[in-house]
Amino acid sequence: MQNLNDSSISVDLTIDLSLSGFTFDLMKDSIDSKMIDLIMDCDTWRNSIVSWFDCILMQPNLTCPQIVRKNRFFSMGLLFTNDLSIRQMNKEWRKKDESTDVLSFPAIDEHIVLPPNQFLELGDIIVSVETAFKQAKIHNHSLMHELRWLVSHGFLHLLGWDHPSSASLNEMLSFQELLLKTPNGSPLRNSMRDY
């Protein structure tokens, strides 16, 4: 496996990230303005995603569609929402009338032929900040750590990872732990570790 701390190795990628958030008014007593700014900083998330791509693309045996391995331009959506909204989406799309922490909607079509330098749509990741906040308290780590955990989980789903068995879930969760250790080069990286 590649040394994840070797910052000299990088894949030249462009990520078009659409970042949307919900009104944090409901959680203003729980989350300070500095954390809200960090959560909603598009560059922070884009840098994390690029570092995760670096990690995946340098390891040819990992699950990743060939169209992704051949492309360098990607588009995806990241939506932060609340429990009520994610419950409605979960009910509509997965027929489960309950809130959840993360949903992902992969959009990759392996058979599409893209012109050079065309953006490949990966899909969308939706995360409930309310659930992430609760889970961060349960696991005794920061909200930002939990959000990165959930976004990395959704990201792997966009790339075709799944966990129908406990063995595949354990493999996916172990790889998520590696992804979270990759340096992301963000100027806010030190701030991310403070939370």
Curated annotation (Swiss-Prot):
Q: What protein name does the entry list?
A: Endoribonuclease YbeY
Query: Which gene specifies this protein's sequence?
Result: ybeY
This enzyme's EC code(s) = 3.1.-.-
The residues that the entry says bind Zn(2+) are 153, 157, 163
Please tell me the species this chain comes from. Answer: Prochlorococcus marinus (strain SARG / CCMP1375 / SS120)
Which InterPro entries does the annotation name? MetalPrtase_cat_dom_sf_prd, YbeY, YbeY_CS
What family is reported? Belongs to the endoribonuclease YbeY family.
UniProt remark on cofactor binding: Binds 1 zinc ion.
Keyword annotations for this protein, in alphabetical order, are: Cytoplasm, Endonuclease, Hydrolase, Metal-binding, Nuclease, Ribosome biogenesis, rRNA processing, Zinc
Query: GO biological process annotations for this chain's record?
Result: rRNA processing
Give one Pfam family, short name only. YbeY
Q: What is its main location?
A: cytoplasm
Q: Which cofactor does it need?
A: Zn(2+)
Q: List the transmembrane segments.
A: none
Task: State its role.
Answer: Single strand-specific metallo-endoribonuclease involved in late-stage 70S ribosome quality control and in maturation of the 3' terminus of the 16S rRNA.
Taxonomic placement:
Bacteria, Bacillati, Cyanobacteriota, Cyanophyceae, Synechococcales
Subcellular localization, per the record?
A: Cytoplasm
Instruction: Look up the record and report any one GO term of the cellular component aspect.
Output: cytoplasm
Listed GO MF terms = metalloendopeptidase activity; RNA endonuclease activity; zinc ion binding
